[in-house]
Amino acid sequence: MISDNARSGMQQAPARSLFNALGFTAEELKKPMVGIVSSYNEIVPGHMNIDKIVNAVKLGVAEAGGVPVVFPAIAVCDGIAMGHVGMKYSLVTRDLIADSTECMAIAHQFDALVMVPNCDKNVPGLLMAAARLNLPTVFVSGGPMLAGHVQGKKRSLSSMFEAVGSYAAGTMTEDDVLEYENKVCPTCGSCSGMYTANSMNCLTEALGMGLRGNGTIPAVYSERIKLAKHAGMAVMDMFRKNICARDIITKESILNALTVDMALGCSTNSMLHLPAIAHEIGFDFDISFANPISEKTPNLCHLAPAGPTYMEDLNEAGGVYAVMKELADIGLLHTDCMTVTGKTIGENIANAVNRNPEVIRPVDHPYSKTGGLAVLKGNLAPDGSVVKRSAVVDEMMVHEIGRASCRERV
C-alpha cells in the first residue's frame, strides 16, 4: 500500500508516534488509508451540509475495511462573491484546490480518495486533482438545493436577479423583491437550476467519477446520505481492484461528458473546466470540440434558467443516467468507458428509464436538434466565445448587425 511509505518499518517509527498522537490504533495502521476531501464551510449554501455527507462517507469507508481521514478544501460562493472585487478571486480557487489537494494527498501518502465537493470551482478543482494524482477516487457531491416557490411557481436564484431587474424597471415593488429574496433559496445545496455547480456535478457522473444520482439527488434528501455511504464503500472496492482515476477520466469519457453537457444544456463554464481536466491527462482539448459535438447532439433538457424545470425534477425523471441512455441509444456515447462502480457506462445505464418526457425529452422529440452550447467566433471574439444556446429565446436567434457597446465596467 502507498500508505506503508508513511507508516511501516523502523524508519517510520517517528511518523507512527504522530499517528499515535492522532489516536490511530495499531490495527488501523495496517489498513488502507482513505483521504476524504471535505469542502465543508459555513459561507457557501452548497457546502453547509458537507459535514453530514463526509460523516456518511467515513461510515462507508470503515464498513468496507478502510481507515477514513478527513482533510479540507476551500470553496467560494460565486453568488456571494458576485458584484464586487471578490469575483476576481473565484476562478483562481479552482487551481488552488487542485494544487493543495495534490499536496495533502502526496505528503500523507493516502491509498485512495473520496472527494466531497459541490459548488462552481470546487468540483473541477477536485477533478483536476483526481486526474493528476491517479489514485482510486470517488466523488460524492453535496447535492442541489430544492427550488423555491413564489406566488405558486417554482423559482431559483436566477429569478432573484430577474426580480432586481424588474424592480429597476418599475414593474415590481420592493415588497415583491423581498418575497423573492426570502423564498428562492429555501434549503442548503447548490443553486437549484442547471448552473455551473450542478452542471459540473452532473458531468462528474457522466465522466464515470460519481455514482448514480451524484448530480441530481437533492442535498436535503436522506437518499444523499445513503449515496455518500455507498461512495465510501465504492472507493474501497476500487482500491482492491486497482481502478484509478485515469482509468476512468480518459479522452473518451471527457467526450462523453461534453455530449451529455450538450443534451442537458449545462453552464457555459463547463467549457472552461473540461479543458483543464483534460489537460491533466494529456488530452489537448479546447472549445473547438464543442460545435462538432453540438451539431449531432440533441438538447433534451430545459432546466432553469433555460426553462421551468429544476434539478429535483431531473432527479425524479431519471437523472443523468436517463439522459445518457437516450444518447447511447442513438450511438452518441462511448459506452465502454470504465466507471467508479467497476462497470462500464453501458452496463450502468442499461436499465435507466426516462420517467418524464417533459423534463427529459426523448431524442426523437428534442428541444432542438443541436446541443445546448455553441462556440461563436468573430471580430468581437477572434479566439472564440461560448453561448448557452438553449437559454436564448427564439426571437433573438436572428442575424443582426449593430454597434457594439463596450464598457470597462457594468
Give the residues covered by each predicted segment.
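Well-ordered alpha-helical segments embedded in enzymatic catalytic cores
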Residues: 96-103, 125, 256
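Conserved phosphate-coordination/catalytic loops
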Residues: 91-95
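Short, glycine/acidic-rich beta->alpha junctions
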Residues: 96-97, 118-122, 252
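A short, small-residue-rich loop immediately preceding and capping a beta-strand
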Residues: 104-126, 137-142
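Catalytic or ion-coupling anion/metal-binding cores of large enzyme and transporter domains
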Residues: 1-48, 53-74, 79-80, 85-90, ...
